[in-house]
């Protein structure tokens, strides 16, 4: 178990089984974590795989980011890559994603109550969730959606801004 650490890695690969708080700066690196409390990262040209995490925050370029289960929050900025979170748990408070040329895929618990704001330019939204829309605007190259899932008075939130990428929200039972 690593309680807290700063990891600097270039042209590498490594695995961490269990950790509390990690700060990661990596380039051209494949990083894999099994269970994490908190990760803050800057990662270019690589792969970051996390099985289970509470809080995730970071920035990547040409990064493939795959998360198994998210329990609390994520704040992500990615260009030219993939962001995939297989399971967003009902206790998650916030997800904020800003992406360019990046595919975004979120598997969301059907019990997660959240407000959503999704702003797309040259991008698309596909959702199998029963989202309620208060605002829904579609222009030739821009799309904007604002509303909620299950409870319009919740404080939980999902904010996605995407340019030149697809956004896919699926119900994950």
Where are these regions (language model features)?
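Intrinsically disordered, low-complexity terminal regions
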Residues: 1-173
């Amino acid at each position: 178990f690593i309680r807290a650490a700063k990891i600097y890695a270039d042209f590498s690969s490594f695995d961490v089984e269990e950790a509390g708080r990690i700060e990661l700066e990596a380039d051209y690196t494949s990083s894999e974590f099994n269970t994490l409390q908190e990760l803050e990262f800057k990662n270019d040209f690589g792969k970051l795989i996390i099985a289970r995490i509470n809080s995730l925050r970071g920035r990547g370029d040409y990064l493939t980011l795959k998360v198994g289960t998210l329990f609390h929050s994520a704040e992500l900025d990615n260009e030219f890559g993939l962001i995939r979170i297989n399971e967003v748990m009902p206790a998650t408070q916030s997800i904020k994603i800003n992406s360019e040329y990046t595919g975004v895929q979120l598997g969301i618990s059907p019990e997660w109550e959240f407000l959503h704001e999704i702003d797309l330019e040259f991008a698309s939204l596909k959702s199998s969730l029963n989202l309620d829309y208060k605002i829904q605007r579609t222009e030739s190259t821009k799309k904007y959606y604002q509303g909620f899932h299950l409870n319009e008075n919740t404080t939980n939130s999902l904010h996605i801004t995407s340019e030149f990428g697809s956004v896919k929200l699926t119900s994950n039972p």
